[in-house]
């Protein structure tokens, strides 16, 4: 029985990434709530009966603004025709701005979830700060996926902000052994520090597998080929199930980010009993406890990162100990807890 209807401006399938996985884990566990998802491209293979996907036309060159305009028009019609109870936007721009516009036009409660780079990059950019401010100030509740993200908010917004951590899919995240390779999972963009990782591992006699895609991919691929770095394998974009398979087998996970709102990939690695080497930035400090469940390296420092990687390569017993501690630590993060927190927010705002 459907007890509530939610309009959800968000990234969703066919796009693979943290926000998509977050949204999927919400909708499949909140079966008594009907979700109308406004996304860039329709996903015809939707398997959830409580989910209706609405395709938002957009121009690739002006993706954000064109989505904002068209999602607002489509969202307004859905709210008026379907009797929507509240709006839950994922990411500040353009999705959060769509939710904010609809809230002001139709007087409907608006929840905004900040996932990381919107609070860390958009908020501080010349072009993005206006959109970030509009989305956050026109939200009744702001959900932050880490304490670090909440602390980035202006003081006048913190009273409406709460922290609800993401969960991990424990069904497919477990230890399958140590197959002697280091793993990176993330976008090939400057923020994720993949270029720092390449600099750190180019001379290390150990195998590394890098999963992801992005604007730095071609540059890194050319560097790997030109320098005959056969120990570095670029695997491109993979499905979450494929990523999980590599995580279960790796020796350790490397998260060399320049900025990170939370770093869910680190928790996923820990759920597989893998030690994590991460940079000392943002929300990663809430997850990776140096010497307990992983090792912390200094930001933008390939030499320090290299030292930490070599420390794990040369000490199998340390890998095992850190991995076991990480497994225990990862139990704090469950989708059940996350969904319970989101449901509570929905109930508070729909009363």
From Swiss-Prot:
Belongs to the glycosyltransferase group 1 family. Glycosyltransferase 4 subfamily. It is an enzyme of class 2 (transferase). This is Uncharacterized glycosyltransferase MJ1178. GO terms for molecular function: glycosyltransferase activity. Its EC number is 2.4.-.-. It comes from Methanocaldococcus jannaschii (strain ATCC 43067 / DSM 2661 / JAL-1 / JCM 10045 / NBRC 100440). Pfam families: Glyco_transf_4, Glycos_transf_1. SUPFAM superfamilies: UDP-Glycosyltransferase/glycogen phosphorylase. Keywords: Glycosyltransferase, Transferase. The lineage of its organism: Archaea, Methanobacteriati, Methanobacteriota, Methanomada group, Methanococci.
């Amino acid at each position: 029985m459907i007890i509530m209807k939610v309009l959800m401006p968000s990234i969703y399938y066919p796009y693979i990434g943290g926000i998509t996985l977050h949204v999927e884990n919400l909708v499949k566990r909140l079966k008594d709530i009907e979700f109308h998802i406004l996304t860039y491209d329709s996903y015809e293979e939707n398997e959830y009966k409580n989910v209706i996907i609405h395709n938002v036309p957009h121009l690739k060159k002006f993706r954000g603004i064109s989505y904002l305009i068209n999602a607002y028009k489509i969202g307004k019609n859905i709210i008026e025709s379907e009797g929507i109870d509240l709006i839950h936007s994922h990411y500040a721009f353009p999705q959060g701005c769509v939710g904010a516009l609809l809230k002001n036009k139709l007087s409907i409660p608006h929840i905004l979830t900040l996932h990381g780079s919107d609070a860390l990059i958009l908020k501080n950019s010349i072009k993005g700060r206006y959109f970030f401010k509009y989305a956050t100030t026109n939200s009744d509740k702001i959900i932050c996926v880490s304490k670090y993200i909440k602390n980035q908010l202006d003081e006048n917004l913190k009273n409406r902000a709460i922290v609800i951590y993401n969960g991990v899919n424990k069904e497919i995240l477990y230890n399958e052994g140590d197959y002697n390779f280091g793993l990176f999972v993330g976008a090939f963009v400057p923020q994720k520090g993949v270029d720092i990782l390449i600099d750190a591992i180019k001379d290390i006699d150990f195998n590394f597998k890098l999963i992801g895609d992005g604007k730095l991919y071609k540059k890194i691929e050319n560097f790997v080929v030109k320098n005959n770095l056969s120990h570095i394998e670029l695997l491109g974009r993979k499905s979450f199930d494929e990523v999980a398979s590599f995580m279960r087998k790796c020796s350790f996970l490397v998260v060399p980010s320049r900025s990170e709102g939370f770093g869910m990939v680190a928790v996923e690695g820990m759920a597989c009993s893998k030690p994590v080497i991460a940079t000392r930035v943002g929300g990663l400090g809430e997850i990776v406890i140096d010497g307990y469940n992983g090792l912390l390296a200094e930001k933008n420092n390939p030499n320090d990162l290299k030292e930490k990687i070599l420390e794990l390569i040369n000490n199998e017993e340390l890998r095992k100990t850190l991995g076991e501690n990480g497994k225990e630590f990862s139990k704090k993060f469950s989708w059940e807890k996350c969904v319970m927190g989101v449901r509570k927010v929905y109930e508070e705002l729909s009363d």
